[in-house]
């Protein structure tokens, strides 16, 4: 068959670097790994590799794993199984590089095979290379694999896509690796307690998009179970604390976002692995007042076809037949989010001299503040007229709706006065009093 066309098709599935890395990690978790290490080097012979201490593969198992659409008939649909079509290893790897190698240790022996698109393009045949011992020993991080009783090492090389698109390969490569680390932290956050994932020897940070440990501040809605064709979908609504009240530790658990607005909505999980997030999936719920609501939806792998999970395992579509059932579970969290957003529980600091004064009339005049009074008395008639025009524009065109939305979405209190220096305040008061005298 036309191997060149097949491999070209696998490369075009649409992985990002981060989603491709996540697909390789899926295989490690499916192999019951308790430790996963990521290593990379962008210099003379660039490589990216994922090493795990999973169950490893025999020669026959490795040969099957390297085939596009590998046989998955022996794979159990259990919580630890994250595979889908038998394409992930090949499609994810080839989406990022022209050559990838898999070395695996089982029964005390390391075996390795590789695909090189340069060779396949030339021969137009699906040529799978079996590495000899010398070639195996030359693989990056192979000594780490040798130390495990069992395990697997996936190595990417020949990064043609990055080379063709990047102004500076080294900078782009390092950036993509750093982005994949953040992506990994979120996508596999529910495995943090059971599986240790390292990037260059440093364990990834803990993430929690729901702040489940913020007892008394975060609110958890009622857990709902939806039966679909005998399989159970679990829905748990969460309402985060108001943005202005988040502690540094909570911000870190959320990934230190610039805004929590874009992270509202459904968090879809397949076997505890995060598939998609930050969207209401066209259910018409997204709004400023709902931004604190996050809905955990656990989908069993038995319902993959119902949810139309894609090859990359990075998106899914909510079926119409269960939309209404899920929306009922969502409503409680949305109500809580609106209540929390309207009443954030954070007061503005009291100040001695207010630039803005809250009054019942709609004209919002600010003429009576001490600094404006002093300035008005110090000016001549022509300057007073210009000041009057400027103040009128400020009073009439206050962007109150933009201020409301921006302040509700801010992670800190805007112009709270907390950073106002005492010395600066004293100097301004003295200047005003001098004019008043």
Predicted feature descriptions by range:
Residues 55-56:
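Glycine-rich G1-box
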Residues 67-70:
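Mobile ATP-lid/nucleotide-binding loop of the nucleotide-binding subdomain
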């Amino acid at each position: 068959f036309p191997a060149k066309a097949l491999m070209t098709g696998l490369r075009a599935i649409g992985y990002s670097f981060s989603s491709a890395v996540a697909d390789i990690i899926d295989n490690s978790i499916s192999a019951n790994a308790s430790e996963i290490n990521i290593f990379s080097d962008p210099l003379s012979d660039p490589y990216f590799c994922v090493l795990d201490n999973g169950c490893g593969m025999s020669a026959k198992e490795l040969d099957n794993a390297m085939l596009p659409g590998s046989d998955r008939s022996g794979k159990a649909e259990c919580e630890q199984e994250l595979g889908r079509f038998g394409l992930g290893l090949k499609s994810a790897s080839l989406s990022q590089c022209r050559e990838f190698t898999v070395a695996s240790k089982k029964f005390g022996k390391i075996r390795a095979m590789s695909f090189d698109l340069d060779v396949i393009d030339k021969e137009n045949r699906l040529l799978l290379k079996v590495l000899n011992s010398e070639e195996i020993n030359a693989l990056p991080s192979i000594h780490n694999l040798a130390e495990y009783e069992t395990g697997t090492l996936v190595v990417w090389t020949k990064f043609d896509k990055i080379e063709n698109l990047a102004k500076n390969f080294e900078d782009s490569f390092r950036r993509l690796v750093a982005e994949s680390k953040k992506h990994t932290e979120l996508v596999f956050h529910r495995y943090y307690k059971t599986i240790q994932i390292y990037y260059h020897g440093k364990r990834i940070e803990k993430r929690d998009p729901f702040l489940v440990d913020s007892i008394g501040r975060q609110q958890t809605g009622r857990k709902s179970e939806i039966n679909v064709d005998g399989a159970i979908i679990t829905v748990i609504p969460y309402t985060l604390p108001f943005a202005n009240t988040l502690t540094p530790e909570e911000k870190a658990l959320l990934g230190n976002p610039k805004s929590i607005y874009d992270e509202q909505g459904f968090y879809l999980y397949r076997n505890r692995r995060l598939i998609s997030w930050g969207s209401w999936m066209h259910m018409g719920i997204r709004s400023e007042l709902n931004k604190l609501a996050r809905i955990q939806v656990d989908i069993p792998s038995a319902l993959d076809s119902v949810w139309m999970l894609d090859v990359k395992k990075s998106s899914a579509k909510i079926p119409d037949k269960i939309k209404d059932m899920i929306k009922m579970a969502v409503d409680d969290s949305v109500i809580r989010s609106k209540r929390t957003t309207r009443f954030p529980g954070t007061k503005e600091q009291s100040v001695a001299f207010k630039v803005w004064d809250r009054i019942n009339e709609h004209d919002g005049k600010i003429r009576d503040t001490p600094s404006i009074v002093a300035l008005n008395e110090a000016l001549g008639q022509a300057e007073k007229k210009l000041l009057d025009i400027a103040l009128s524009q400020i009073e009439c065109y206050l962007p109150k709706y933009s201020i409301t939305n921006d302040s509700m979405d801010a992670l800190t209190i805007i112009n709270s006065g907390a950073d106002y220096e005492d010395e600066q305040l004293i100097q301004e008061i003295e200047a005003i009093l001098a004019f008043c005298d």
